[in-house]
UniProtKB/Swiss-Prot annotation:
Keyword Lyase: yes
Modified residues (2,3-didehydroalanine (Ser)): 187
Name of the protein in question: Phenylalanine ammonia-lyase
Post-translational modification: Contains an active site 4-methylidene-imidazol-5-one (MIO), which is formed autocatalytically by cyclization and dehydration of residues Ala-Ser-Gly.
Catalytic activity: L-phenylalanine = (E)-cinnamate + NH4(+)
Protein family per UniProt: Belongs to the PAL/histidase family.
Major subcellular site: cytoplasm
Active-site residues, Swiss-Prot/TrEMBL: 93 (proton donor/acceptor)
Gene3D superfamilies hit by this protein: Fumarase/aspartase (Central domain), Fumarase/aspartase (N-terminal domain), Phenylalanine ammonia-lyase 1, domain 3
Higher taxonomy: Eukaryota, Viridiplantae, Streptophyta, Embryophyta, Tracheophyta
Signal sequence interval, chain numbering: none
Record pathway: Phenylpropanoid metabolism; trans-cinnamate biosynthesis; trans-cinnamate from L-phenylalanine: step 1/1
Cytoplasm found in the keyword field: yes
GO MF terms, alphabetically ordered: ammonia-lyase activity; phenylalanine ammonia-lyase activity
Amino acid sequence: MACAWRSRSRADPLNWGKAAEELSGSHLEAVKRMVEEYRKPVVTMEGATTIAMVAAVAAGSDTRVELDESARGRVKESSDWVMNSMMNGTDSYGVTTGFGATSHRRTKEGGALQRELIRFLNAGAFGTGTDGHVLPAAATRAAMLVRVNTLLQGYSGIRFEILETIATLLNANVTPCLPLRGTITASGDLVPLSYIAGLVTGRPNSMATAPDGSKVNAAEAFKIAGIQHGFFELQPKEGLAMVNGTAVGSGLASMVLFEANVLSLLAEVLSGVFCEVMNGKPEFTDHLTHKLKHHPGQIEAAAIMEHILEGSSYMMLAKKLGELDPLMKPKQDRYALRTSPQWLGPQIEVIRAATKSIEREINSVNDNPLIDVSRGKAIHGGNFQGTPIGVSMDNTRLAIAAIGKLMFAQFSELVNDFYNNGLPSNLSGGRNPSLDYGFKGAEIAMASYCSELQFLGNPVTNHVQSAEQHNQDVNSLGLISSRKTAEAIDILKLMSSTFLVALCQAIDLRHLEENVKNAVKSCVKTVARKTLSTDNNGHLHNARFCEKDLLLTIDREAVFAYADDPCSANYPLMQKMRAVLVEHALANGEAEAHVETSVFAKLAMFEQELRAVLPKEVEAARSAVENGTAAQQNRIAECRSYPLYRFVRKELGTEYLTGEKTRSPGEEVDKVFVAMNQGKHIDALLECLKEWNGEPLPLC
């Protein structure tokens, strides 16, 4: 094994080549691999653990942990070397010496020294156990898996049987209780990891969470897990091997990054859906723009959005409306849409780099001293310094904050009728806008989420304090940064859930808009032909030429500017149709002087007839949409983004929201948020991209 490692090292002595190779391929393919790994029923610890494997075991699902049996020999060699070296009088840190700044002290009582290590490191506070001072069980499970993965590599001087016991606890879903706070992740996560050691050694203060959520002591924990042997009496170095590592910080970081990768992909797809419902211009995804910028994250983000928008029924309709009247909206969309690939691309690059950094960390040997059996020596170093965790988590959290900022900007445009290209204010879906304020509360909530998320974007790693008698004078704060990033992920999921519900509301509003517009055009056409086509004698009337302009007026007018009262003289529809008739009357010349040929004389009859029938037609169109019998089916069914809409509306059973119903936005958002926490959105997300070949559309 050592020879093979040296051979690889000579080929790539600084590991830059391997690090670069790990980032090859698309981010989408990387996410697909993560999801596939997450769903495997067995995780075998073979020194190639991924963040997805850690996240799967952390979730406490049916994923089983198996140790690589071939590791038993090298683990035993390392353990035996420690025992032999102590018997031979070798002076080794943490075996015959004190710890940290007091390592000048000496003892020959190796077992007692390990017991004392665990005792003095049990310095955490748990409160009542229910008031938020206990590390979540999922994070503890992640830490257990990562620590075992490190110790299996055979450089730490610990018995294989201890690792088997930790794996047994994992498989039985029995989780030691660890304090939420109290580690600086250098020299490793000493305080929290000491509670795992405390459980396997049977310390009286050790507690665990049973599969049913109850708290049990160490003896009950072993019994529930089916562990027959008693508690371990630690041999020299074994306590230090268990606590002197970065597993708690890197374990939680693994969980965080699994979600961050999925959520960043979701943000790309939601930007595409945002373009669809906003009648945006897909030109912003053109590959040449992004090719000339060179950044791979941006190029992929644009290509994914391009794929979502290619052939989209909404984009076809938006193009048609744009050709009808190029001045209906600005020449370019606002930055939240038009520069979304440029904004998201760097965040994806940061998250990918952090993912690989953490995967290197969870597969590293990160305790001290390291036992090199081949050279017969203990090497004193500092791999316990969790700087890759602190830095990666700070960077990831800043990326998450940036994604949330973009999402909030897009949401703010979506609910604002000055910017959303014809959708109602606050996405109000009811008949009476004076009694329906739609997503107004949701926008306030989104502002709150975004503000907190931007605060969390501040770094943790610049708040280092010198610790442990100035021995640990620089330290990574890895777990603290991981915890803050986990908070940020939670907030981004709240924002994503809220945005997704709002986008589905907008999709349904576009469906209603199209059906109401068609109904209005049909009604106006019928009324125009009835009242404007002929005079009292049945002769063709000049007013008949108004029909085309009347229909063009309807096409240009925002449906929700008049839908609640289509014949109101205060609303633009009737005003603009009247203006059409007046303009034709002014152009009618001398014929206007005679009542039989006057266009203006037809105006009152036209409006009177329209008032009699148009409100009924609009209500009928609205009712048909609500009943599922609309003449024009919802365009979303023809789009690549449909799986996400189907997930929210069909699978989760959320509703189109109106002030007339009792259902609140928060109730619907909560359904999506809970499902997102359970990972149920992932399949729908990936289905949106199942046809993408991993490349931008060719330039032509």
